[in-house]
Amino acid sequence: MKQVNFCGTGRRKTAVARVILTNGTGKITINTKNFETYLPQPTTRLDMLQPLIISEKKDVYDVRVNVNGGGLCAQAGAIRLGIARALLESIPELRPVLKKAGLLTRDARCVERKKYGLKKARRAPQFSKR
């Protein structure tokens, strides 16, 4: 059987994930580590696996991920989007299912920049009336 690769890129905050799906048994590696050791929190792992669970393809594909930037939650979000896009490349009929679950939408929220004259993005110095 010929090995077929499906690629997807996901971003969240400053994290960038490059995902490669190959036909296999459901093995998931992130930066050459097992995904359970890379993402210790079960909620983060579940969030990352959502596209595979919803499409019922968890044991059909092996997932290889290269991710950098951001924290673990942002990386999990980036991986989730990358997996969803790669699944869409392999099975275009999944689009309505993934779209309904909101897995194809890039979360555009990121840190607001600090403005001059303020202590943080919106926190102003204490005001004194007298």
UniProtKB/Swiss-Prot annotation:
Domain of life, per UniProt, equals Bacteria
The record's GO CC annotations read:
cytosolic small ribosomal subunit
List the Gene Ontology MF annotations in alphabetical order.
RNA binding; structural constituent of ribosome
InterPro entries with a match to the protein in the record = Ribosomal_Su5_D2-typ_SF, Ribosomal_uS9, Ribosomal_uS9_bac/plastid, Ribosomal_uS9_CS, Ribsml_uS5_D2-typ_fold_subgr
Tell me the keywords, alphabetical order: Ribonucleoprotein, Ribosomal protein
What single Pfam family name could you report for this chain, choosing any that match?
Ribosomal_S9
Which Gene Ontology BP annotations are present? translation
Q: Which family does it belong to?
A: Belongs to the universal ribosomal protein uS9 family.
**Matches recorded under HAMAP family:** Ribosomal_uS9_B
Q: Which NCBIfam families does this entry report, sorted A to Z?
A: PRK00132.1
Q: What is this protein called?
A: Small ribosomal subunit protein uS9
Which species does the entry assign this protein to?
Answer: Phytoplasma australiense
The encoding gene: rpsI
